[in-house]
């Protein structure tokens, strides 16, 4: 996606590390100053390319490159096309590699060292993997980036999937309010050195208060008022999510399922800009 470089460069402050990949201003090495408040609304949006169709994903990435901040590629696409497919679709476009690693520490560490070679802006793991796994993930991302001579991606933890409600958690033995579990996992991730979490819109304000202003909140479950909620139970509008304290928004079917994906993306951005 050659014109993706222009989209990525639109909101760049600098190149980080010794590699040549482009990264948004807020995506930097641990301890460096973040600047998410300086990003324009469109730069905060990552569009989920949840498809196994390579041509479709590539077309969406190309059409949206100048309209949003990046793309999210998950397990459906990755299982079908692997690393080469990711490179073909997301080359030059800021990438959220959403593979939600959750395994024993050594396995997760090895997977992340390999994932770093794809130069993602964000990668993620399940916070429920526990402290040892999370600490191994932090170390693996740093070492993998150094060894591969590329910038270190931001490492995020998944707290509780947006498709789950309190009844669902009870069925798998997690007792207590869902929001308490989300905060517990977010605090664990922060203590282990991760850069942020993936959380639902309903937990944004609570996690911002609990984890502070420099902890990245990547928020799926984003649905404009004119879009249907689908299978996610904890959703909100883009404007409300940013107002609550989200840093980045993941938008999927409201854009990719629209008759004109580019027009849908423009509509979301315009609504955000109108809200100021």
Language-model segment annotations:
Residues 23-30:
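Short, positively charged and aromatic/hydrophobic N-terminal segments
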Residues 41-42, 103, 107-113, 118-195, ...:
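Conserved anion-binding
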Residues 47, 71, 100, 123, ...:
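Conserved, mostly hydrophobic/aromatic
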Residues 61-66, 84-92, 113-117, 141-143, ...:
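Acidic (Asp/Glu)-rich catalytic clusters
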Residues 73, 83, 200-246, 250:
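A C-terminal functional module that forms or caps the active site or interfaces directly
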Residues 120-130, 224, 234, 238-264:
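Glycine-rich phosphate-binding active-site loops on the catalytic face of alpha/beta enzymes
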Residues 134-138, 255-276:
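C-terminal helical cap(s) of enzyme catalytic domains, especially alpha/beta-barrels
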């Amino acid at each position: 996606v050659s014109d993706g470089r222009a989209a990525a460069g639109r909101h760049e402050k600098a190149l980080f590390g010794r590699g040549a990949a482009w990264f948004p201003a807020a995506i930097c090495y641990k301890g460096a100053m973040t600047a998410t408040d300086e990003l324009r609304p469109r730069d905060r949006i990552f569009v989920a390319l949840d498809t196994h169709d390579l041509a479709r994903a590539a077309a969406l990435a190309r059409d949206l490159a100048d309209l949003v901040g990046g793309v999210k590629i998950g397990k459906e696409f990755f299982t079908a096309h692997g690393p080469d497919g990711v490179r073909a679709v997301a080359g030059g476009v800021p990438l959220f590699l959403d593979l939600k690693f959750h395994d024993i520490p050594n396995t997760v560490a090895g997977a992340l060292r390999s994932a770093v070679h794809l130069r993602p802006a964000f990668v993620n793991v399940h916070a429920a993997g526990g402290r040892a796994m999370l600490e191994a993930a932090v170390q693996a991302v740093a070492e993998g980036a150094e060894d591969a001579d590329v910038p270190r991606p931001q490492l995020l933890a998944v707290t509780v999937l947006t498709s789950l409600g309190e009844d669902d958690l009870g069925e798998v033995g997690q007792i207590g309010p869902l929001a308490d579990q989300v905060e517990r996992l977010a605090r664990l991730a922060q203590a282990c050195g991760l850069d942020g979490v993936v959380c639902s819109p309903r937990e944004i304000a609570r996690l911002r208060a609990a984890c502070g202003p420099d902890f990245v909140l990547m928020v799926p479950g984003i649905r404009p008022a004119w879009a249907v909620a689908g299978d996610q139970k904890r959703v909100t509008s883009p404007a409300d999510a940013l107002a609550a304290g989200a840093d980045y928004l993941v938008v999927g079917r409201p854009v990719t399922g629209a008759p004109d994906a580019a027009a849908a993306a423009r509509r979301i951005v315009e609504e955000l800009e109108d809200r100021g």
